[in-house]
């Protein structure tokens, strides 16, 4: 899922000059206030900021107005126009070298809270692109998709887990407009995936954080048509929605309550949460109980069940002592090697075999994520290799791939209420080359887990759009999980 604001089909004619159809450079919707600044060059010439405008939903914004738009959602499938004022509109087929630089921040990924009522520090997303583009009338057509999977064997009462997927697995294709929401669910059904359906609300709900009646009708019609079952509703807390300050505790509560109500409206029994602030959880517990929702904090790489931050969450849970609280186990935490998808990506970015090998050696050590990342960047600089050529991969390689032992999940098994069956590849032998699925299945079967395993393909963080069909991979992963859990059951 390339981290770009523009694609090969982005350049359009506009009455005021030229326009660039922008793509949101992330996997979920963001507030327009998440955009700090955008600058453009055309054929090497810098465009003055006063000659740039953004058009979204019938409104026009100056670049310096964008950080103020905390009430305006840039939905993942929207492509606002960045209008560049020129003396004349270009002709169709006219070629130009377009450079674009965008600085964004991710409002739900807080590095440090603000002090004295000021804004906190948030994870940035920096985009730098330079592409040769030709003027087009509109976006490229989506490619035809081929069904290559035979019908799956039916689920049985003896299967310990129910299978499903998070629609996040098709993030890149959904963002590109290859599917609308209905079409995505139809494709899932066509491939025999399910019955569990999980969503990230900020990705799929156009009126986020509110679930509209129109979305509810679409949702119910698809579920009735295909016999799906709602498994997990992914909630974020957009603490940095405003640029001048963080959310207040009351705003955090109200925002979360809106999401919980949306989850209930869609029929979800469980909400995946990413904030475990004790006071916020204490206020939200009565809401969850009233709405009959389970709350599950996600344990994700680089952490595991016994990492220090997770131990603090476990202590908070013990203090609150509520049956509503649990965990989502994300298998990015328990990988035995780096994914081939990532290794292909860093090779495309220019790393040679020596650098790729050194990256894997550093990853396998027991140093902290930050220490490993800094050691690798130091190695690159020592070889006069620019870490910037890797973009976000220099960080994601160590942040998204954890190497905790699968057996550690047993330490919290009674509190695990949902599973993200994270994966990146399925090889020719039907195995995940970086994650030991037979061992994970054994740990969870023997630990007594009996909930959903929700497939989550996160290869889109590293793969190019169209490099693989993620939903075909999900079907193949389901075959692996199904075979593994039935083998364990047969051995008991």
Q: Language-model segments: what does each one mean?
A:
Residues 195-220, 460:
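Glycine-rich, proline-tolerant flexible connector loops at the mouths of alpha/beta enzymes
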Residues 161-167, 195-199, 230-235, 271-273, ...:
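Hydrophobic faces of well-ordered beta-strands that scaffold small-molecule active sites
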Residues 147-152, 225, 229, 239-331, ...:
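Active-site acidic/histidine proton-transfer and metal-coordination neighborhood
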Residues 174-181, 210, 306, 310, ...:
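Gly/Pro-rich active-site loop or hairpin
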Residues 166-181, 239-253, 274, 400, ...:
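Active-site mouth loops of central-metabolism enzymes
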Residues 179-202, 261-270:
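Catalytic domains of carbohydrate-active enzymes, especially glycoside hydrolases
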Residues 1-145:
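Terminal leader/tail segments of proteins
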Residues 146-180, 234-237:
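Boundary/entry segment of secreted carbohydrate-active catalytic domains
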């Amino acid at each position: 899922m390339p981290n770009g604001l523009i694609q090969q089909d982005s350049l359009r004619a506009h009455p005021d000059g030229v326009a660039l159809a922008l793509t949101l450079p992330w996997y979920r919707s963001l507030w327009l206030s998440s955009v700090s600044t955008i600058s453009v060059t055309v054929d090497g010439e810098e465009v003055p900021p006063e000659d740039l405008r953004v058009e979204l939903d019938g409104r026009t914004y100056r670049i310096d107005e964008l950080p103020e738009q905390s009430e305006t959602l840039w939905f993942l499938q929207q492509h606002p126009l960045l209008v560049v004022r020129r003396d004349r509109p270009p002709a169709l087929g006219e070629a130009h070298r377009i450079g674009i630089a965008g600085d964004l921040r991710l409002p739900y990924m807080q590095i440090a809270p603000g002090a004295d009522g000021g804004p906190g520090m948030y994870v940035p997303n920096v985009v730098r692109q330079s592409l040769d583009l030709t003027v087009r009338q509109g976006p490229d057509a989506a490619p035809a998709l081929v069904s290559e999977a035979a019908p799956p064997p039916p689920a049985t009462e003896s299967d310990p887990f129910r299978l499903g997927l998070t629609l996040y697995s098709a993030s890149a294709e959904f963002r590109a407009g290859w599917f609308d929401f209905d079409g995505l669910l139809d494709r899932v059904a066509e491939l025999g995936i399910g019955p569990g359906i999980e969503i990230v609300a900020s990705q799929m709900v156009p009126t986020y954080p509110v679930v509209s009646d129109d979305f509810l009708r679409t949702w119910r019609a698809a579920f009735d048509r295909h016999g799906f079952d709602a498994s997990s509703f992914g909630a974020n807390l957009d603490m940095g929605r405003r640029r001048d300050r963080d959310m207040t505790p009351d705003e955090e509560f109200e925002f979360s309550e809106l999401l919980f109500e949306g989850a209930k409206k869609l029929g979800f029994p469980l909400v995946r949460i990413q904030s475990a602030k004790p006071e916020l959880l204490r206020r939200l517990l009565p809401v969850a109980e009233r709405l009959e929702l389970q709350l599950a904090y996600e344990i994700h790489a680089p952490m595991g069940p016994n990492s220090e931050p997770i131990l603090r969450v476990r202590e908070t849970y013990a203090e609150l002592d509520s049956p509503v609280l649990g965990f989502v186990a994300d298998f990015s935490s328990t990988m035995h090697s780096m994914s081939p998808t990532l290794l292909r990506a860093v090779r495309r970015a220019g790393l040679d075999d020596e650098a790729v090998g050194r990256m894997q050696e550093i990853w396998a050590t027991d140093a902290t994520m930050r220490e490993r990342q800094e050691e690798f960047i130091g190695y690159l600089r020592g070889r006069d290799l620019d870490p910037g050529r890797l973009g976000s991969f220099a960080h994601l390689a160590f942040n998204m791939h954890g190497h905790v032992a699968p057996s550690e999940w047993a330490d919290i098994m009674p509190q695990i209420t949902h599973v993200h069956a994270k994966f990146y590849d399925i090889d020719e032998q039907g195995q995940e080359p970086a994650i030991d699925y037979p061992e994970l299945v054994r740990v969870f079967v023997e630990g007594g887990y009996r909930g959903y395993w929700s497939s989550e393909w996160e290869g889109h963080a590293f793969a190019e759009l169209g490099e693989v069909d993620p939903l075909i991979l999900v079907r193949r992963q389901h075959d692996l999980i199904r075979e593994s859990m039935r083998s364990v059951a047969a051995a008991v």
